[in-house]
Swiss-Prot record:
HAMAP family, per database record: RNase_P_1
Catalytic activity: Endonucleolytic cleavage of RNA, removing 5'-extranucleotides from tRNA precursor
Name of protein: Ribonuclease P protein component 1
Species of the source: Ignicoccus hospitalis (strain KIN4/I / DSM 18386 / JCM 14125)
Record-level Gene Ontology MF annotations: ribonuclease P activity; RNA binding
The UniProt record lists the keyword Cell inner membrane: no
Domain of life, per lineage: Archaea
Name of the gene this protein is made from: rnp1
Coiled-coil intervals, chain numbering: none
Location within or outside the cell: Cytoplasm
The EC number(s) this enzyme carries: 3.1.26.5
Statement: the UniProt record of this protein carries the keyword Repeat: no
Matches recorded under Pfam families: RNase_P-MRP_p29
Function per UniProt: Part of ribonuclease P, a protein complex that generates mature tRNA molecules by cleaving their 5'-ends.
Amino acid sequence: MKHTPKNVIYHNLVGLRVEVLAHPDPSMKGLKGRIIDESKSFLTIEKDNGELVKVQKLGTFVLVLPSGRKVEVRGELLRGRPEERLKKFLKA
């Protein structure tokens, strides 16, 4: 299944570029990088300088799809493990 704006929340996000637009922790706002790991509640982002940062799946994110298209996503839609989100998609 290809990443599209409608189904991106049901995919594993590892490998996608991301930017934090808004977050309850103000130090996370503006953070950019590549998602290298994803858990139920956190994204691990590798910044361009190689630094790893764990970010809670709260606030608002911009994900860059493999096609280059940018999608704005609310963090609460990303909560849960990728396989759990996919199960919800398949049931719908």
